[in-house]
Regions:
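Bacterial N-terminal signal peptides that target proteins for export
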Residues: 2-13
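Sec/Tat-exported extracytoplasmic proteins
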Residues: 45, 60-67, 89, 116-120, ...
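Bacterial signal peptide processing site
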Residues: 25-28
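N-terminal segment of the mature soluble domain
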Residues: 39-89
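Acidic/histidine-rich, surface-exposed loop or edge segments in extracytoplasmic proteins
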Residues: 36-44, 141-146
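C-terminal/domain-edge helix-coil "capping" segments
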Residues: 143-175
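Surface-exposed short loop/turn segments
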Residues: 81-128, 134-147
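C-terminal motif of bacterial Sec signal peptides marking the signal peptidase cleavage site
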Residues: 20-23
Length: 175
């Protein structure tokens, strides 16, 4: 008898948990806010062919935001929002050393400068966004270290794009 009630109890518990979460206002993060704020976004990119720029355009397209690349000498439309993104800066510095006085751990910092404007008003004044990670260097596996740095840098770019999208969704932009 108890074996038959156990699956029902699990189902009831799961259902109650879902109802409680939706009742308190919890919902998965979505890009609806972004697409409702910006139908079209003009992008002024320092390097339109960089990996960061491609990830940003792909993410904005996934959020149903139409993007137009703005050439550096072109006159922007007055009623459209312009997102200016500078070149990504990648800095690498040693954090710790091993007994042989060689760097054992490094910190990688990836940063970009952004600004958002519409007409004469600045929605987001020029600011720097950054992400940092650390990794251990294996002296015996230099090739593996390079691969690890490339993987970490790609993850950091994705995180920086997500950070930028969340910044664009900020409630301060609703005015």
């Amino acid at each position: 008898m108890r074996r038959r009630l156990l699956p029902l109890a699990k189902l009831a518990f799961g259902l109650i948990l879902v109802l409680l979460l939706t009742g308190c206002g919890y919902s998965l993060r979505s890009n609806d806010v972004l697409s409702s704020q910006f139908d079209t976004l003009q992008l002024q990119l320092q390097d339109p062919n960089s990996e960061f720029s491609r990830l940003l355009r792909r993410s904005l397209d996934a959020a149903d935001v139409t993007t137009n690349l703005l050439q550096s000498n072109a006159q922007p439309g007055t009623d459209l929002a312009i997102l200016s993104v500078g070149n990504e800066q990648l800095a690498n510095r040693p954090v710790s050393v091993n007994p042989r006085a060689r760097a054992a751990q490094y910190e990688i910092r990836l940063s970009i400068e952004i600004a958002l404007s519409r007409g004469d008003s600045e929605l987001i004044p020029r600011e720097t966004m950054s992400v940092q990670r650390s990794y251990f260097e294996d002296i015996d596996n230099i090739t593996g270290n390079r691969d690890e740095v490339q993987i970490i840098t790609a993850e950091m770019r994705r995180e920086l794009v997500n950070q930028l999208l969340r910044r664009l969704q900020a409630p301060a932009l609703e005015s």
